[in-house]
Amino acid sequence: MTEKPSVVATLFRFQSVFGLLAVFVAAIIFSPRKNGAILFVSADNLANVVRAVSEIGIIAVGMTFVILIGGIDLSVGAVLGLAAVGSAVLMVENDWGFLPSVLLVLVTGTIFGALQGVATAMIGIQSFIVTLAGLQIARGLARIWSGGQGVAISYGDGPKEAPTSFALLGERTFGGLVPIPVLIFAVVAIAAVVFLRVSAFSRHLYAVGGNEKAARLSGVPVVRVKIAVFAICGLLASLAGIVHAVQLNQGSPNDGIGYELDAIAAVVIGGTSLAGGRGSVAGTVAGALLLGVLNNILALNNIDSNIQLLIKGLVIVAAAALQRLRPAS
Protein backbone atom coordinates (compact mmCIF):
# COMPACT_ATOMS: atom_id res chain seq x y z
CA MET A 1 0.00 0.00 0.00
CA THR A 2 1.41 3.37 -1.04
CA GLU A 3 1.87 5.77 1.84
CA LYS A 4 0.24 9.15 1.30
CA PRO A 5 2.60 12.13 1.49
CA SER A 6 2.27 14.21 4.65
CA VAL A 7 1.01 17.78 4.64
CA VAL A 8 4.54 19.00 5.36
CA ALA A 9 5.97 17.00 2.45
CA THR A 10 3.29 18.40 0.15
CA LEU A 11 4.06 21.96 1.25
CA PHE A 12 7.75 21.46 0.52
CA ARG A 13 7.02 19.82 -2.82
CA PHE A 14 5.07 22.86 -3.98
CA GLN A 15 7.07 25.49 -2.09
CA SER A 16 7.69 27.58 -5.19
CA VAL A 17 4.00 27.66 -6.10
CA PHE A 18 2.94 28.65 -2.59
CA GLY A 19 5.74 31.21 -2.51
CA LEU A 20 4.61 32.67 -5.83
CA LEU A 21 1.02 32.94 -4.61
CA ALA A 22 2.17 34.62 -1.39
CA VAL A 23 4.31 37.15 -3.27
CA PHE A 24 1.51 37.79 -5.77
CA VAL A 25 -0.97 38.53 -2.97
CA ALA A 26 1.59 40.74 -1.23
CA ALA A 27 2.21 42.57 -4.52
CA ILE A 28 -1.50 43.36 -4.82
CA ILE A 29 -1.68 44.56 -1.21
CA PHE A 30 1.39 46.79 -1.40
CA SER A 31 0.98 47.96 -4.99
CA PRO A 32 0.71 51.71 -5.55
CA ARG A 33 -2.70 52.95 -6.69
CA LYS A 34 -3.56 55.36 -9.47
CA ASN A 35 -7.09 56.78 -9.53
CA GLY A 36 -8.08 53.91 -7.25
CA ALA A 37 -6.72 51.25 -9.64
CA ILE A 38 -4.06 48.77 -8.52
CA LEU A 39 -1.06 49.39 -10.78
CA PHE A 40 0.40 45.91 -10.32
CA VAL A 41 -2.57 44.11 -11.88
CA SER A 42 -2.89 46.44 -14.86
CA ALA A 43 -2.59 44.65 -18.20
CA ASP A 44 0.45 46.68 -19.24
CA ASN A 45 2.29 46.00 -15.99
CA LEU A 46 1.59 42.26 -16.01
CA ALA A 47 2.81 42.15 -19.62
CA ASN A 48 6.01 43.87 -18.49
CA VAL A 49 6.42 41.31 -15.70
CA VAL A 50 6.17 38.29 -17.99
CA ARG A 51 8.34 39.92 -20.66
CA ALA A 52 11.06 40.51 -18.08
CA VAL A 53 10.72 36.96 -16.79
CA SER A 54 10.96 35.38 -20.25
CA GLU A 55 14.73 35.83 -20.66
CA ILE A 56 15.70 34.69 -17.16
CA GLY A 57 13.12 31.92 -17.39
CA ILE A 58 14.58 30.47 -20.59
CA ILE A 59 18.07 30.52 -19.07
CA ALA A 60 16.78 29.04 -15.80
CA VAL A 61 15.24 26.07 -17.63
CA GLY A 62 18.67 25.23 -19.03
CA MET A 63 20.25 25.83 -15.63
CA THR A 64 17.80 23.35 -14.11
CA PHE A 65 19.20 20.57 -16.30
CA VAL A 66 22.75 21.39 -15.20
CA ILE A 67 21.93 21.63 -11.50
CA LEU A 68 19.95 18.38 -11.63
CA ILE A 69 23.22 16.55 -12.42
CA GLY A 70 24.95 18.35 -9.56
CA GLY A 71 26.68 20.93 -11.76
CA ILE A 72 26.54 24.69 -12.20
CA ASP A 73 26.87 26.98 -15.22
CA LEU A 74 28.18 30.47 -14.51
CA SER A 75 28.63 31.29 -18.20
CA VAL A 76 24.97 31.62 -19.22
CA GLY A 77 24.79 35.40 -18.82
CA ALA A 78 27.91 35.86 -20.95
CA VAL A 79 26.61 33.39 -23.55
CA LEU A 80 23.40 35.45 -23.67
CA GLY A 81 25.54 38.53 -24.35
CA LEU A 82 27.49 36.68 -27.03
CA ALA A 83 24.24 35.62 -28.71
CA ALA A 84 22.79 39.14 -28.55
CA VAL A 85 25.96 40.56 -30.11
CA GLY A 86 26.06 37.82 -32.72
CA SER A 87 22.45 38.44 -33.74
CA ALA A 88 23.05 42.18 -34.10
CA VAL A 89 26.39 41.94 -35.92
CA LEU A 90 25.31 39.25 -38.38
CA MET A 91 22.08 40.97 -39.40
CA VAL A 92 23.10 44.64 -39.19
CA GLU A 93 26.79 44.70 -40.11
CA ASN A 94 27.07 41.55 -42.23
CA ASP A 95 23.60 41.75 -43.86
CA TRP A 96 22.77 38.14 -43.05
CA GLY A 97 19.18 36.96 -43.20
CA PHE A 98 17.01 36.20 -40.19
CA LEU A 99 17.17 32.39 -40.26
CA PRO A 100 20.92 32.00 -41.02
CA SER A 101 21.77 34.47 -38.25
CA VAL A 102 19.54 32.81 -35.66
CA LEU A 103 20.74 29.32 -36.60
CA LEU A 104 24.42 30.28 -36.37
CA VAL A 105 23.90 31.95 -33.00
CA LEU A 106 22.05 28.92 -31.62
CA VAL A 107 24.65 26.49 -32.95
CA THR A 108 27.44 28.62 -31.46
CA GLY A 109 25.81 28.57 -28.02
CA THR A 110 25.20 24.83 -28.23
CA ILE A 111 28.81 24.08 -29.17
CA PHE A 112 30.08 26.44 -26.47
CA GLY A 113 28.01 24.61 -23.87
CA ALA A 114 29.03 21.19 -25.19
CA LEU A 115 32.72 22.10 -24.94
CA GLN A 116 32.21 23.05 -21.32
CA GLY A 117 30.53 19.69 -20.83
CA VAL A 118 33.55 17.96 -22.38
CA ALA A 119 35.89 19.79 -20.00
CA THR A 120 33.74 18.75 -17.06
CA ALA A 121 32.87 15.18 -18.03
CA MET A 122 35.99 14.00 -19.87
CA ILE A 123 38.79 16.08 -18.38
CA GLY A 124 37.30 16.11 -14.89
CA ILE A 125 37.45 19.84 -14.13
CA GLN A 126 34.75 21.03 -11.75
CA SER A 127 31.87 22.73 -13.52
CA PHE A 128 32.26 25.83 -11.34
CA ILE A 129 35.81 26.38 -12.64
CA VAL A 130 35.01 25.44 -16.23
CA THR A 131 32.03 27.76 -16.52
CA LEU A 132 33.76 30.58 -14.65
CA ALA A 133 36.42 30.42 -17.35
CA GLY A 134 33.65 30.08 -19.94
CA LEU A 135 32.11 33.30 -18.65
CA GLN A 136 35.35 35.17 -19.34
CA ILE A 137 35.82 33.53 -22.74
CA ALA A 138 32.26 34.33 -23.88
CA ARG A 139 32.60 37.95 -22.74
CA GLY A 140 35.90 38.24 -24.58
CA LEU A 141 34.45 36.75 -27.77
CA ALA A 142 31.49 39.14 -27.56
CA ARG A 143 33.82 42.13 -27.23
CA ILE A 144 35.95 40.96 -30.16
CA TRP A 145 32.88 40.28 -32.33
CA SER A 146 31.35 43.70 -31.61
CA GLY A 147 34.57 45.70 -31.49
CA GLY A 148 33.91 46.38 -27.83
CA GLN A 149 30.81 48.45 -28.61
CA GLY A 150 27.08 47.87 -28.51
CA VAL A 151 25.47 47.32 -31.91
CA ALA A 152 22.12 49.06 -32.39
CA ILE A 153 19.50 47.20 -34.41
CA SER A 154 17.38 49.11 -36.91
CA TYR A 155 14.92 47.36 -39.19
CA GLY A 156 14.23 47.55 -42.91
CA ASP A 157 15.28 46.18 -46.29
CA GLY A 158 18.34 48.37 -46.79
CA PRO A 159 22.01 47.84 -45.90
CA LYS A 160 22.95 47.88 -42.23
CA GLU A 161 19.36 47.01 -41.31
CA ALA A 162 18.03 43.83 -39.75
CA PRO A 163 15.11 42.04 -41.43
CA THR A 164 11.70 43.19 -40.21
CA SER A 165 10.87 39.54 -39.47
CA PHE A 166 13.33 39.73 -36.55
CA ALA A 167 11.50 42.74 -35.09
CA LEU A 168 8.23 40.81 -35.09
CA LEU A 169 9.61 38.52 -32.37
CA GLY A 170 9.53 41.45 -29.98
CA GLU A 171 6.60 43.48 -31.28
CA ARG A 172 3.91 40.91 -31.94
CA THR A 173 1.63 39.14 -29.50
CA PHE A 174 -0.06 35.76 -29.71
CA GLY A 175 -3.83 36.12 -29.76
CA GLY A 176 -3.45 39.81 -29.03
CA LEU A 177 -2.52 39.05 -25.42
CA VAL A 178 0.68 37.01 -25.03
CA PRO A 179 3.95 38.68 -26.12
CA ILE A 180 6.01 36.47 -28.44
CA PRO A 181 9.01 36.33 -26.02
CA VAL A 182 6.66 34.99 -23.35
CA LEU A 183 5.27 32.43 -25.80
CA ILE A 184 8.84 31.29 -26.57
CA PHE A 185 9.50 30.87 -22.84
CA ALA A 186 6.25 28.93 -22.41
CA VAL A 187 7.08 26.58 -25.29
CA VAL A 188 10.59 25.97 -23.91
CA ALA A 189 9.25 25.30 -20.41
CA ILE A 190 6.47 22.95 -21.56
CA ALA A 191 8.85 21.05 -23.85
CA ALA A 192 11.33 20.66 -20.98
CA VAL A 193 8.64 19.46 -18.56
CA VAL A 194 7.38 16.87 -21.04
CA PHE A 195 10.94 15.81 -21.90
CA LEU A 196 11.83 15.22 -18.25
CA ARG A 197 8.66 13.21 -17.71
CA VAL A 198 8.75 10.84 -20.66
CA SER A 199 12.32 10.47 -21.93
CA ALA A 200 14.84 7.83 -20.93
CA PHE A 201 17.44 10.59 -20.87
CA SER A 202 15.66 12.22 -17.93
CA ARG A 203 16.05 9.05 -15.86
CA HIS A 204 19.77 9.07 -16.63
CA LEU A 205 19.94 12.75 -15.71
CA TYR A 206 18.36 12.24 -12.28
CA ALA A 207 20.50 9.15 -11.73
CA VAL A 208 23.72 11.08 -12.38
CA GLY A 209 22.62 13.84 -10.03
CA GLY A 210 21.54 11.44 -7.32
CA ASN A 211 24.66 9.25 -7.28
CA GLU A 212 27.11 9.53 -10.15
CA LYS A 213 29.17 6.48 -9.19
CA ALA A 214 26.12 4.26 -8.88
CA ALA A 215 24.77 5.60 -12.17
CA ARG A 216 28.04 4.78 -13.94
CA LEU A 217 28.09 1.25 -12.48
CA SER A 218 24.52 0.68 -13.63
CA GLY A 219 25.42 1.51 -17.22
CA VAL A 220 24.28 5.13 -17.45
CA PRO A 221 26.38 7.00 -20.08
CA VAL A 222 27.48 9.66 -17.60
CA VAL A 223 29.87 11.47 -19.96
CA ARG A 224 27.26 11.80 -22.71
CA VAL A 225 24.62 12.95 -20.23
CA LYS A 226 26.87 15.71 -18.89
CA ILE A 227 27.91 16.93 -22.33
CA ALA A 228 24.28 16.93 -23.51
CA VAL A 229 23.10 18.84 -20.44
CA PHE A 230 25.68 21.62 -20.87
CA ALA A 231 24.89 21.77 -24.60
CA ILE A 232 21.19 22.24 -23.79
CA CYS A 233 22.07 24.99 -21.33
CA GLY A 234 24.21 26.77 -23.94
CA LEU A 235 21.45 26.45 -26.54
CA LEU A 236 18.84 28.00 -24.24
CA ALA A 237 21.20 30.79 -23.13
CA SER A 238 21.69 31.67 -26.81
CA LEU A 239 17.94 31.59 -27.40
CA ALA A 240 17.52 33.99 -24.47
CA GLY A 241 20.18 36.21 -26.06
CA ILE A 242 18.18 36.41 -29.28
CA VAL A 243 15.06 37.34 -27.29
CA HIS A 244 17.10 39.91 -25.37
CA ALA A 245 18.44 41.53 -28.56
CA VAL A 246 15.01 41.82 -30.16
CA GLN A 247 13.44 43.29 -27.02
CA LEU A 248 16.17 45.94 -26.56
CA ASN A 249 16.90 46.46 -30.29
CA GLN A 250 20.62 46.08 -29.67
CA GLY A 251 23.38 43.64 -28.86
CA SER A 252 26.07 44.59 -26.36
CA PRO A 253 29.00 42.60 -24.95
CA ASN A 254 27.78 43.71 -21.52
CA ASP A 255 24.32 42.19 -21.96
CA GLY A 256 23.39 39.49 -19.48
CA ILE A 257 25.71 40.55 -16.66
CA GLY A 258 24.39 38.95 -13.46
CA TYR A 259 21.78 36.86 -15.29
CA GLU A 260 23.50 33.66 -14.20
CA LEU A 261 22.80 34.56 -10.56
CA ASP A 262 19.13 35.29 -11.25
CA ALA A 263 18.82 31.99 -13.12
CA ILE A 264 20.40 30.05 -10.24
CA ALA A 265 18.12 31.90 -7.83
CA ALA A 266 15.03 30.90 -9.83
CA VAL A 267 16.14 27.25 -9.80
CA VAL A 268 16.83 27.27 -6.04
CA ILE A 269 13.58 29.07 -5.22
CA GLY A 270 11.84 26.51 -7.42
CA GLY A 271 12.97 23.73 -5.09
CA THR A 272 15.75 22.11 -7.13
CA SER A 273 18.54 20.81 -4.93
CA LEU A 274 21.98 22.26 -5.63
CA ALA A 275 23.36 18.82 -4.73
CA GLY A 276 21.56 17.40 -7.78
CA GLY A 277 19.12 14.58 -8.31
CA ARG A 278 15.98 16.40 -7.19
CA GLY A 279 13.95 19.19 -8.74
CA SER A 280 11.70 20.13 -11.62
CA VAL A 281 11.34 22.61 -14.46
CA ALA A 282 7.83 23.47 -13.27
CA GLY A 283 9.29 24.59 -9.96
CA THR A 284 11.90 26.67 -11.77
CA VAL A 285 9.19 28.42 -13.81
CA ALA A 286 7.36 29.28 -10.59
CA GLY A 287 10.65 30.48 -9.09
CA ALA A 288 11.35 32.73 -12.09
CA LEU A 289 7.84 34.18 -11.91
CA LEU A 290 8.27 34.78 -8.18
CA LEU A 291 11.47 36.73 -8.81
CA GLY A 292 9.80 38.67 -11.61
CA VAL A 293 6.84 39.67 -9.44
CA LEU A 294 9.17 40.59 -6.58
CA ASN A 295 11.37 42.74 -8.83
CA ASN A 296 8.33 44.47 -10.29
CA ILE A 297 6.60 45.34 -7.02
CA LEU A 298 9.85 46.66 -5.55
CA ALA A 299 10.35 48.86 -8.62
CA LEU A 300 6.73 50.10 -8.55
CA ASN A 301 7.26 51.21 -4.96
CA ASN A 302 10.53 52.96 -5.88
CA ILE A 303 12.51 50.88 -3.40
CA ASP A 304 16.21 51.76 -3.42
CA SER A 305 18.17 49.39 -5.67
CA ASN A 306 20.49 48.40 -2.82
CA ILE A 307 17.50 47.47 -0.66
CA GLN A 308 16.09 45.48 -3.59
CA LEU A 309 19.28 43.42 -3.72
CA LEU A 310 19.09 42.86 0.03
CA ILE A 311 15.48 41.66 -0.15
CA LYS A 312 16.15 39.33 -3.09
CA GLY A 313 19.17 37.92 -1.28
CA LEU A 314 17.09 37.16 1.79
CA VAL A 315 14.47 35.41 -0.35
CA ILE A 316 17.15 33.19 -1.91
CA VAL A 317 18.64 32.35 1.50
CA ALA A 318 15.16 31.49 2.81
CA ALA A 319 14.56 29.18 -0.17
CA ALA A 320 17.91 27.44 0.37
CA ALA A 321 17.17 27.07 4.09
CA LEU A 322 13.82 25.47 3.30
CA GLN A 323 15.64 22.87 1.19
CA ARG A 324 17.71 21.91 4.24
CA LEU A 325 14.52 21.37 6.24
CA ARG A 326 12.78 19.40 3.50
CA PRO A 327 11.89 15.81 4.51
CA ALA A 328 13.78 13.10 2.65
CA SER A 329 11.72 11.64 -0.18
Report residues per predicted region.
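Single transmembrane alpha-helix segments in multi-pass membrane proteins
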Residues: 26-31, 42-94, 98, 118-125, ...
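Transmembrane alpha-helical segments in multi-pass inner-membrane proteins
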Residues: 231, 237, 247-313
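Loop-to-transmembrane alpha-helix initiation sites
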Residues: 14-16, 127, 154, 177-185, ...
